[in-house]
């Protein structure tokens, strides 16, 4: 799937309030890089970061996939800047997908959160 195709699929399957102006920067095989932006004056809440994790995991595993198990470690506060999500599929077994996601604050390029998940496609 190309970046443009993935962008369209995510926009179709992600509620508008959860998109955070998402932009697919790179989509290669099972690795995906997506940028998320805040509305000026807002800050990233943990709930917003987990929403981004869900979207980024689906970007790698398949936009119709649903998270069945999630383990997340919040490493530090996110800066009031764009967040970059790097997600990748670790293993596929039938309709089960194991994936991980890293979130980075774009302003200082530091990891903000790491998550591992199991999804059903």
Model-predicted segments: where are they?
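HotDog/MaoC-like acyl-thioester-processing domains
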Residues: 1, 62, 69, 76-80, ...
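Non-catalytic linker/capping segments at the edges of enzyme domains
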Residues: 1-37
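Short solvent-exposed loop/turn micro-motifs enriched in small/polar/acidic residues
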Residues: 15-19, 65, 94-96
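Short structured motifs
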Residues: 18-24, 68-74, 85-86
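Active-site helix/loop of acyl-thioester processing domains in fatty-acid/polyketide metabolism
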Residues: 44-67
């Amino acid at each position: 799937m190309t970046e443009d195709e993935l962008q369209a699929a995510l926009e179709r399957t992600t509620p508008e309030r959860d998109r955070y102006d998402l932009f697919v920067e790179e989509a290669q095989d099972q690795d995906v890089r997506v940028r998320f932006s805040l509305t000026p004056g807002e800050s990233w809440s943990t709930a917003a970061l987990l929403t981004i994790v869900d979207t980024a995991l689906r970007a790698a595993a398949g936009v119709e996939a649903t998270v069945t198990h999630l383990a997340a470690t919040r490493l530090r506060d996110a800066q009031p800047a764009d967040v970059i999500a790097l997600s990748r599929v670790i293993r596929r077994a039938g309709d089960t997908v194991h994936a991980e996601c890293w979130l980075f604050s774009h302003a200082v390029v530091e990891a903000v959160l790491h998550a591992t998940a199991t999804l059903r496609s």
